[in-house]
């Protein structure tokens, strides 16, 4: 089940960001969702796949029907164990989305996807804030020189403080992090 990612460079010809593949004229990018456990990255992946028309119904990790969690143990435990991919069109792009495990026990599985990425989305739970594993992921992304979008999830939960969280992200990850919401929720 994990072979699909193992040879993604060769199979897809790993078309670098902004280049087109030979068999179609769409630009191809490869993006991965990375996060500490329970930050909501698989749910975010489901939402993206749904909004882009790849799936007709959003699954849920806690219901055992998430599109990218296909292994029986993943569905039983409600966790991602193996990195999975989905390919979908988005405007003039062809996007390969990789959903990766968030549990530290499966970090090697997550780390092997870093070699093929054009971009990463680092998901942080607004309720939990920056975790130790979040910082580890950030350092890995820096080491591999992968451009990162930080997505703060679960901001609707009680006790979240947007300004304090942004200050913590800037302190613990990078002072160059900026807020794209422009004050709009």
Spans of model-derived segments:
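Conserved C-terminal guanine-recognition region of P-loop GTPase G domains, centered on the G4
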Residues: 124-176
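Conserved glycine-bearing catalytic or ligand-binding loops at nucleotide- and phosphate-handling centers
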Residues: 48, 158-161, 178-185
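Short, Lys/Arg-enriched N-terminal segments with co-localized hydrophobic residues
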Residues: 1-16
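Residue-level "edge-of-site" marker
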Residues: 87, 154, 183
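P-loop NTPase switch module centered on the Walker A-proximal segment
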Residues: 18-124, 128-130, 173, 177-179
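Non-catalytic, charged/low-complexity accessory segments that flank nucleotide-binding cores
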Residues: 13, 18, 22-26, 157-163
